């Protein structure tokens, strides 16, 4: 009986190993939610408060959804974003940082802007949450 229980434990471990998304996968999902203008999923995948440091200016928002204005984004020419580089800087049990380079594109698939950002993620209730973004240079969130 003891062997059977051990067998079941070892066999079930891989089933649960894939349930937790990596920090890099979490950021990829975050970009997908952004492209879909899915404010509820963005808020669910981010920590509260959410902090952006853009061009050296730190701003805290109650939720990520409070930081972005999709109508303003569209007015700036944005249609969608695409990640070019997604590198894990570090990861421990409670935090991680991911280095991202991405571009924003317009409706004609032309690059509107290209930006480097480092995202800070925290582990909350068994899931990675995007807690903050550190943007090199300027980046509109549609509220300008």
Regions found by a protein language model. Name each.
Residues 30, 41-42, 50, 98, ...:
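Hydrophobic pocket/interface hotspot
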Residues 114-144:
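Short beta-strand edge/turn micro-motifs at domain boundaries
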Residues 35, 104-106, 121:
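Beta-strand elements of well-folded, non-transmembrane domains
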Residues 67-110:
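Surface-exposed, charged secondary-structure patches
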Residues 1-7:
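Sec-dependent signal peptide recognition
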Residues 46-61, 76:
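A short gly/proline-enriched turn/hairpin at secondary-structure junctions
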Residues 46, 56, 100-104, 117-119, ...:
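A mature extracytoplasmic/lumenal domain signature
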Residues 8, 12-40, 44:
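Short, low-complexity N-terminal intrinsically disordered segments enriched in polar/charged residues
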């Amino acid at each position: 009986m003891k062997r059977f229980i051990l067998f079941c434990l070892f066999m079930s471990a891989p089933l649960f190993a894939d349930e937790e998304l990596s920090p890099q996968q979490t950021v990829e999902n975050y970009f997908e939610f952004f492209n879909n203008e899915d404010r509820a999923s963005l808020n669910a995948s981010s920590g509260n408060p959410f902090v952006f440091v853009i061009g050296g200016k730190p701003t805290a928002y109650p939720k990520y959804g409070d930081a972005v204005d999709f109508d303003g984004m569209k007015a700036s020419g944005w249609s969608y974003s695409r990640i070019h580089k997604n590198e894990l800087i570090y990861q421990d049990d409670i935090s991680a940082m991911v280095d991202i380079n991405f571009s924003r594109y317009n409706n004609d698939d032309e690059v509107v802007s290209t930006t480097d950002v480092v995202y800070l993620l925290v582990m909350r209730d068994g899931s990675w949450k995007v807690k903050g973004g550190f943007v090199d240079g300027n980046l509109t969130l549609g509220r300008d």
